[in-house]
Amino acid sequence: PNRHGGHGYTSPDVLEAGAKWAFSKGAGEVWIGDGPVWSMVGDSLNEYFRSSGLLDACERSGAKPLDFHAGEYRLFRPNHPDLPETIGFSEYLYQADVVISVPLMKTHFNTLVTLGIKNLKGCIRPADKLTFHTIELNAAIAEVNRLMAGLVTATVVDGSVAYEGMGPGGA
């Protein structure tokens, strides 16, 4: 997530509740993952998980924190002339039995709202993420969702906080 302007990311309380729910339904292991573009390596990512409350949510629920950028990427060739030649998706997604996307309900100055479809940008390579904001973002998001079709099992929107206005920074 882009953490300027306040709470612009999924509530740790919602993620904690979701992890506990998954365990109650028989999950043997639950991972809470993120791939923030501003925090790409080592200690800064650990600091992000701590400062955002994700680490505490993991500890309280028994889930494990997962850095989508710590592993390899599965590469795909997009079907859109304005997109990068390849787009990399975190390999961790393909190792999971179930993938649940939990986006915050918020507005966005480029896309009007961001829900499940834009939330998946956390799973792609940082360089690809940055490129998406220099091209037609809606087309990029649509292509990401086409390439990831069938990968996400469910999307649960976090409505505990909702943005109004020019988000995410000015909402």
List each model region and its residues.
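N-terminal and secondary-structure boundary signal
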Residues: 1-171
